[in-house]
Amino acid sequence: MDEYKIIAVDFDGTLCYSDWPALGDPNERLIAYLRNWRDQGNKLILWTCRAGKALEDAIAWCRDQKLEFDAVNDNLPEIVEMYGNNSRKISCDYYIDDRSVLPEAVGY
């Protein structure tokens, strides 16, 4: 997958300043960055704990922001083919999540 990079991005607290299950204001700077990223031929995965109607609402909210995804809560088909399985963990180059932390930051 050298021809493009993959970002998996969270919804609540990352793309959308929300109080689950309500929808809130967009993180406009991040959304603009991700639209540009995808316009350059890279891939985006929406990676969220939302399911059912809450997930449908989040996807519609993203479309209203002109933000489209190559996959939602799933690996890209080419990744599944490359590895021969569909791991529960999303395979990507970068994870963007308001609850993420680098290993060095946990103080071990």
Predicted regions and their residues:
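HAD-like aspartate-dependent phosphatase fold
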Residues: M1-Y108
